[in-house]
Amino acid sequence: MGSKGLKGVMVCLLILGLVLEQVQVEGKSCCRTTLGRNCYNLCRSRGAQKLCSTVCRCKLTSGLSCPKGFPKLALESNSDEPDTIEYCNLGCRSSVCDYMVNAAADDEEMKLYVENCGDACVNFCNGDAGLTSLDA
């Protein structure tokens, strides 16, 4: 992967961080800041709750509200999670995948980016995200 592809992957990861900030999923973790929430969500794609909460300075809670000083709670159980996932996919594809398509050098590379980026958005929004390369 050339520097153009690496730059695209870096931008993709940054935009996914923004998506994480906007799309909340049901959970029982509370974080002090949005950065902590993003850290926790990204960590949870591979790590355990307790480890991620410690590393990202978040707290695990069994209730629907967060302790004082930890305002960043994921959506409560009455949320419309399917709508959230649908909007996550739409936002991910329109921002991240559009950027990747515009960065493609030719039609073949563009098709590869569209296919892999769409799959990555589905996995990301459904909570199955892993850090993988787009040139698989």
Curated annotation (Swiss-Prot):
Pfam families: Thionin (PF00321). Keywords: Disulfide bond, Plant defense, Secreted, Signal, Toxin. Residues 1-27 form the signal peptide. Residues 73-136 form a propeptide. GO terms for cellular component: extracellular region. Gene3D superfamilies: Thionin-like (3.30.1350.10). Disulfide bonds join 30-66, 31-58, 39-56, 43-52. It comes from the Eukaryota. GO terms for biological process: defense response. InterPro entries: Thionin, Thionin-like_sf. Transmembrane segments: none annotated. It is found in: Secreted. GO terms for molecular function: toxin activity. Thionins are small plant proteins which are toxic to animal cells. They seem to exert their toxic effect at the level of the cell membrane. Their precise function is not known. Belongs to the plant thionin (TC 1.C.44) family. 4 C-C subfamily. This is Alpha-2-purothionin. It comes from Triticum aestivum. The gene is THI1.2.
